[in-house]
Amino acid sequence: MLKKDMNIADYDPELFNAIQNETLRQEEHIELIASENYTSPRVMQAQGSQLTNKYAEGYPGKRYYGGCEYVDVVETLAIERAKQLFGATYANVQPHSGSQANSAVYMALLKPGDTVLGMNLAHGGHLTHGSPVNFSGRLYNIIPYGIDESGKIDYDEMERLAVEHKPKMMIGGFSAYSGIVDWARMREIADKIGAYLFVDMAHVAGLIAAGVYPNPVPHAHVVTSTTHKTLAGPRGGIILSAADDEDLYKKLNSAVFPGGQGGPLMHVIAGKAVAFKEALEPEFKAYQQQVVKNAKAMVEVFLERGYKIVSGGTDNHLMLVDLIGRDLTGKEADAALGSANITVNKNSVPNDPRSPFVTSGVRIGTPAITRRGFKEAEAKELTGWICDILDDAHNPAVIERVKGQVLALCARFPVYG
C-alpha cells in the first residue's frame, strides 16, 4: 500500500538535493530568459495530483479507456477556458509541447515536400518554422523570410516570396522578434496565393490573452502556443482556431491523436486549466502590461549606455542585444552574467558572423522578473548592472559586486513569498 507520507527527501536524497538546489537557484538568480516564467503553486498542485495516474486516449466523451468521467471534466474545462481566453471556436489542449503542437499542424495541413514560408531562424524565427536541423526543414521545402535593415518584418519581401514560390502554408510567429506582427497583412498575403496561415504565438500568448498584443486567432487558419512562457502555465502546448471549419478541426485532432501522440498528460492538462483561469483574471492583464513596461524600460537603459538593440526597441516582452563590433561574444556575455546570478541566453542576431554556438547577441525577456514583482525602477537598475558587466566582462571584481546587488534584490522580491 502506498502511504501519503512518503517523501523524496528520505528515499532519494540525491534527487531531493538537486530539486532543493534548483529551488534556491530560482530564488537567488534573476531570470531573464525570454521563454521562462514562474508558474503558480495552484498549477503545480494540479500537476502533482493523482490525475497523473490516469490514461485517457481519445477526447472527452470519446475515450478508448473506461473511468474517464472526471478527466473528461478536467479536459473540457481547459478547452472551454482556452477558447474563451483567445476568442477561438476550437481548442486542443493535449499537445505535450509547443513543438508537438506545431508538428501536428504540419501533419494536418501538409504533405512531405510541400512548400512552406517561415521566418528565418537567424532573423528571429523558431526551429520548427523550417530550420534544416528540425523535422520542419527536413520534411518540407522551406522558403525563409526575414527582417529589413530597420529590424522589422519585411512584408513586401514576404509577399514577393509568397507570389514567387506559392507555399501551401505561411508561418507567423517568432522566438526572438521584439516588434508587433501584422497578422491581417499576413492573412491578406496568404489569401492572395491560396495558402494556409499558421501562427505560432508561443512567445506572446500571455500578452495576447491580456489584450496588450494583437490576437492572431481571428486572422489565422490555425494558431498554436506553448502554455508556459508569458502565459505562465505548465510546460505544454495548445492548438486553437476560429476558422469555423469542422473538417479542419477533425484533421487537427487526428494529427494530435493518434497521429503524433498517445495518451494525454491529464495532470498537465489540469495545470493548463488552472493557468487559463488565472489568465482570465483582471490582475493578469495588469501583469502583462507591466511586462511590456519593464521591457521598454530596459531597452531605454541599454540604448543610453550605447548598446544596440535589434529593431531599435521593443513592443513586447523581449529584446535582442546586438554585440557585433564589440570584443565580446554572446557566449561570453551569457557566462559573465551567469557568474553574477543573472540568467540570459546567447542568441544569434541578423547577419551574425559567429556560429549559433557562440553568437553575437543575447536575448533578454521580462516575464519572470515581472512575475516576482519588479517594476520599471528595478528593471532599469538591473539593466545598469548588466551593462556594467558587458562593459568589463572579464573583471571578477565587477561580477562579484553585481552578484551581491543581485542577491540583495532577489531577497527583496522572492519568487514564492
Curated annotation (Swiss-Prot):
GO terms for cellular component: cytosol. InterPro entries: PyrdxlP-dep_Trfase (IPR015424), PyrdxlP-dep_Trfase_major (IPR015421), PyrdxlP-dep_Trfase_small (IPR015422), Ser_HO-MeTrfase (IPR001085), Ser_HO-MeTrfase-like (IPR049943), Ser_HO-MeTrfase_PLP_BS (IPR019798), SHMT-like_dom (IPR039429). Keywords: Amino-acid biosynthesis, Cytoplasm, One-carbon metabolism, Pyridoxal phosphate, Transferase. Its EC number is 2.1.2.1. Gene3D superfamilies: Aspartate Aminotransferase, domain 1, Type I PLP-dependent aspartate aminotransferase-like (Major domain). (6S)-5,6,7,8-tetrahydrofolate binds at L121, G125, H126, L127, S355, P356, F357. CDD domains: SHMT. One of its GO terms (biological process) is glycine biosynthetic process from serine. The modification N6-(pyridoxal phosphate)lysine is found at K229. Its cofactor is pyridoxal 5'-phosphate. Pathway: One-carbon metabolism; tetrahydrofolate interconversion; Amino-acid biosynthesis; glycine biosynthesis; glycine from L-serine: step 1/1. It is found in: Cytoplasm. The keyword Amino-acid biosynthesis applies. It is an enzyme of class 2 (transferase). It catalyses: (6R)-5,10-methylene-5,6,7,8-tetrahydrofolate + glycine + H2O = (6S)-5,6,7,8-tetrahydrofolate + L-serine. Catalyzes the reversible interconversion of serine and glycine with tetrahydrofolate (THF) serving as the one-carbon carrier. This reaction serves as the major source of one-carbon groups required for the biosynthesis of purines, thymidylate, methionine, and other important biomolecules. Also exhibits THF-independent aldolase activity toward beta-hydroxyamino acids, producing glycine and aldehydes, via a retro-aldol mechanism. Homodimer. NCBIfam families: PRK00011.1. Belongs to the SHMT family. This is Serine hydroxymethyltransferase. It comes from Shewanella sp. (strain MR-4). The lineage of its organism: Bacteria, Pseudomonadati, Pseudomonadota, Gammaproteobacteria, Alteromonadales.
